[in-house]
């Protein structure tokens, strides 16, 4: 897969499918990007589980923090990595030992590791690198276009709210190739 660009349907398919996200490297500090993304995804209805060895046993926004992925007592759909690119391979290796395996490895902005991506894809996982799910969610739902940001999703209508569930905003049109 070309990890320099992703189709909207690929990203939309992931964000519409995953429900439980393990966020590796989330910070309890309110001024950190990982905290913003963690809070945003929680507010959109995702189950987000913080993973940070230095904060293990504590809580971030009411969610128990785990030291490592293997300690999480429930299935994970996506692993969102907020760590330096050099730290990605052991995180992917650990994710691949989970049963069931997660569906997606997502590496945040500036995080890329081609070897880890190939390893995850060889095991059947989808991979996204150098992207932020908060930004992608806002762009695809047209949510950020209402605050003056060009989301590349043109609409004269306010983003649709879905009420309760996995997400609060509809992520654009459904298509037959979502998830490809």
Regions found by a protein language model. Name each.
Residues 95-123:
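ADP-ribose/adenylate-binding Rossmann-like module
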Residues 3-7, 58-74, 80-90:
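Glycine-rich, highly charged phosphate/nucleotide-binding loops
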Residues 54-55, 70-71, 108-112, 131-136:
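Short, acidic/turn-prone active-site loops that include or flank metal/cofactor-
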Residues 59-61, 76-77, 114-118, 136-143:
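Short, charged, surface-exposed secondary-structure boundary motifs
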Residues 29-31, 39-59:
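NAD(P)-binding Rossmann-fold cofactor-contacting core
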Residues 1-17:
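Short N-terminal or domain-adjacent regulatory/targeting segments
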Residues 136-180:
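A charged, well-structured terminal subsegment
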């Amino acid at each position: 897969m070309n990890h320099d660009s992703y189709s909207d349907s690929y990203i939309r398919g992931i964000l519409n499918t995953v429900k439980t996200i393990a966020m590796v490297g989330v910070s309890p500090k309110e001024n950190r990007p990982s905290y913003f993304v963690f809070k945003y995804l929680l507010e959109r209805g995702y189950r987000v589980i913080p993973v940070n060895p230095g904060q293990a046993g504590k809580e971030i926004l009411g969610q128990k923090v785990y030291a490592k992925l293997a300690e999480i007592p429930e299935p994970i759909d996506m692993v969102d990595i907020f760590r330096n690119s050099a730290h990605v391979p052991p995180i992917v290796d650990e994710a691949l030992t989970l049963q069931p395996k997660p569906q997606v490895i997502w590496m945040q902005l500036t995080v890329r590791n081609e070897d880890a991506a190939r390893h995850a894809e060889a095991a059947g996982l989808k991979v996204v690198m150098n992207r932020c799910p908060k930004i992608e969610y806002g762009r695809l739902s047209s949510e950020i276009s209402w605050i003056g940001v060009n989301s590349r999703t043109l609409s004269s209508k306010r983003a649709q709210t879905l009420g309760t569930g996995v997400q609060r905003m509809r992520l654009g049109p459904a298509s037959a190739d979502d998830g490809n």
